Amino acid sequence: QISTSTWPMSGDEIQRALSQAKISNNAQQKVIDSIQNALKVDNQTAKLDLFAETDQKNIPQAFGDHTKAQYVGSLELNAGGENWDGKLRVNAEKDPQIDNGQDVNVEGSYIAGKLWNQWLIAGQMPTYWGPGHDGSLIRGDASRPVYGFTAQRAEQKAFDTKWLSWVGPWQYQAFAGQLDDYEAIPDAKILGFRLTAQPLPYLELGASRILQWGGEGRPESWDSLWNAIKGNDNFNDGDDDKSNQIAGFDGRLNLQPLLDVPVSLYGQYVGEDEAGLLPSKKMYLAGADFSSSYKNMPYQLYAEWADTRTNGDAKGISYSHYIYQDGYYQHGFPLGHAMGGDGEMISVGGDIRFDVMNRLSGRVMYAKVNQSAAHFGDDQINKAFPEDDKIKALDLTWTHYLKPTLPLKINGWVSDSDRQGNDAGASIGIEIPLDRDIFGF
């Protein structure tokens, strides 16, 4: 079993899991074929991505939705070997939903090297920490990616020594980067560490921690960083309080090995501060998913609940800080859950693979966003949802492979907002490999 709660994932681990997969029916083979198709598309030497939508989609973003503008054209080049990998992705955007002041960017680009089962990566890649389908409380991908460095294991193998083998397959991810256009504290840094382990075949546990630290006018000495890492800076004094910190735990329980039921239960909680060495001022997420097949068509269903209020109350604390006054956001869009702080969301969704060339996914949701909007007045830090609002939405995506390496995605949505009224729209995206075979040469 492979852990999918820490993104980006290592290609080494994906290939290892595929090579060890025990396929017992056609539905499972379809899942494997779909994954291999997706890998082929992602690793094309050169490709052109085109995206357009009729209107900006003002609902909490789904996991993996990396398009941040209404019209996007991207040229991508990929290269690599056994111990190195690189991607250059140049994106041209028009009518951005997340305005970073640039019409052209290199989001999604990176260069990486591997040594002793460790990848060291420099670039601007989407990151996601947690078991949720529709959001992570601590590190989501609803904002533009943060520039920085990432380190993680190539393969999630267990320790060889008998003293630590009980930990099971494990992974870590360490990140250090700098926030872009963070006006409250220019050049503010973000540092994070996540650790996951599977001590039992049916149980995965994770722990994550994030620090906002440094920046213009703030201490950036090794001593101040060490105090922040130790947690010795939780004071209401700007001279002593060196960082804004968020930390928490998550877990996933797979009931298939225990009860022969294809259901998993998962949960996550994080806190804005600590009390008694554990996170306090907590936010919560919980869900369940079910996997099966219908007439050899594999499908998955899930239900998820998230609450980014503070211990169930909207107090203007979640994802905010009195020194880092732009909060836990970049360009005003959340670095944590897609709805931002002081929100509640219930979603039900899933996907079905009709065959190796066709997949349908979708979700329905109800969200109460930015319930502390009155607290911030004219100084809203949540630009994704700057008003106290209630949103109901249906979001559907059909993915059709015109050829095994030529995916076409068509998305449609309808929504109803107390503030903005009814809305509907559609988008289309296509990834075109730039090789001779696709054009019939």
Descriptions of predicted regions:
Residues 1-65:
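N-terminal periplasmic/intermembrane-space "pro-region" immediately following the signal or transit peptide
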Residues 3-7, 25-26, 34-46, 80-86, ...:
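Short loop/turn motifs that connect adjacent beta-strands in outer-membrane beta-barrel proteins
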Residues 36-92, 120, 170-174:
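Transmembrane beta-strand segments of Gram-negative outer membrane beta-barrel proteins
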Residues 52-58, 81-83, 92-96, 115-117, ...:
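Transmembrane beta-strands of outer-membrane beta-barrel pores
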Residues 60-63, 93-97, 134-139, 179-181, ...:
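Extracellular loop and loop/strand-boundary signature of outer-membrane beta-barrel proteins
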Residues 68-166:
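Well-ordered mid-protein domain cores that form the structural environment of catalytic cofactors
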Residues 148-325, 341, 346-348, 353, ...:
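Signature for the C-terminal beta-barrel architecture of outer-membrane proteins
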Residues 195, 400, 422-441:
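Outer-membrane beta-barrel "beta-signal"
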